[in-house]
Regions:
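Surface-exposed helix-capping loop/turn segments at secondary-structure junctions
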Residues: 59-66, 128-138, 177-183
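Short, contiguous alpha-helical
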Residues: 21-24, 43-47, 51-54, 66-103, ...
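Bacterial Sec-dependent N-terminal signal peptides
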Residues: 1-25
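Short coil/turn linker and secondary-structure boundary residues
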Residues: 60, 74, 105-108, 131
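Acidic/histidine-rich, surface-exposed loop or edge segments in extracytoplasmic proteins
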Residues: 27-39, 96-106
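Acidic/histidine-rich alpha-helical segments that form the ligand environment
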Residues: 108-145, 151-167
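Residues within well-ordered alpha-helical secondary structure of globular protein domains
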Residues: 59, 82-85, 119
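N-terminal targeting signals for Sec/Tat export/insertion, comprising classic cleavable signal peptides
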Residues: 29-64
């Protein structure tokens, strides 16, 4: 019996360590695309967001997640939920997949939100790669409540969700600094790499 419990605990610990060590997307920004097609430019913007988000959210503590500078502001955890929801929309737009509302993500943990957001951004970037201007006509932001669908052109994604995610990622960087846990000072957002 003791051997069985010990084996089970060892197995759980091993899987837990593997999950923690799993390399998430955007540790560094991907290589440049071959050309400046409209899809590649948008993909690069998504990659820039992914890189910033990766480092803004890496190593957050419980104190960081619950920190809020004022009573009426969002804390970091609430901001992570908000960004995750928008990352779903960024991922769905190239395939015109409806964003069904309301979406219940209340059970997601910090780790779930971080991994899910990074994977969504990676999928969105890959979906945009090498797309031309004509392809954008088929990309839609679609909100669905019940049977009612409201579509918007991809333009709204650029000035809406994509810009909003960049904005909120900056807020996370500021809030974690205020809570005493600043991001790694060796990050170069210009080069999309960690300085050696």
């Amino acid at each position: 019996m003791k051997k069985s419990i010990l084996f089970s605990l060892t197995l759980i610990f091993t899987f837990s360590m593997h999950a923690q060590n799993e390399e998430l997307p955007y540790h560094q920004i991907p290589e440049y695309p071959e050309n400046y097609s409209p899809g590649n430019v948008v993909a690069r913007m998504i990659d820039g967001l992914g890189f910033r988000y990766h480092w803004a959210t890496k190593g957050l503590t419980e104190k960081d997640l619950t920190y809020k500078p004022s009573e009426d502001g969002r804390n970091i955890m609430e901001t992570l939920f908000h960004i995750y929801g928008m990352s779903e929309m960024i991922k769905n737009a190239p395939t015109a997949t409806p964003n069904v509302r309301p979406m219940d993500i209340s059970e997601l943990t910090y780790e779930d939100l971080r991994k899910g957001t990074l994977k969504n951004l990676q999928a969105a970037s890959q979906a945009m790669a090498d797309k031309n201007a004509a392809d954008f006509e088929d990309f839609k932001v679609i909100f669905q409540r019940g049977e009612k669908q409201t579509p918007y052109p991809y333009w709204n994604m650029l000035n809406g969700m994509l810009s909003d995610c960049i904005y909120h990622t900056g807020q996370i960087t500021l809030l974690r600094r205020a809570s005493g846990n600043p991001i790694n000072p060796n990050i170069s957002v210009f080069n999309g790499r960690l300085r050696e």
